[in-house]
Amino acid sequence: MNNTIRELLKKHAGLPVSVDGLDDGADLYAAGLSSFASVQLMLALEENFDIEFPDSLLNRKSFQSIEAIARTVASIVDDRKVA
């Protein structure tokens, strides 16, 4: 999943640094992720993983790092399986 997230970051985040050079725990906002880019990334994640982000997860913490995004996506997928 992290590799997919990296590819989506490359396409949609417009970071001024190389996504490949970022650790999974690196702060994406410190690396240059804007609020606009985070929305574009969210839309790409929703399309790619066939999910919908609930309002409760639309916050900076959910998109802080590749690890955080992976946890957030996994929790949405897990919740969908339970429902």
Describe every region a protein language model picked out:
Residues 1-33, 37-42, 47-83:
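Phosphopantetheine-dependent thiolation modules in NRPS/PKS and related acyl-activating systems
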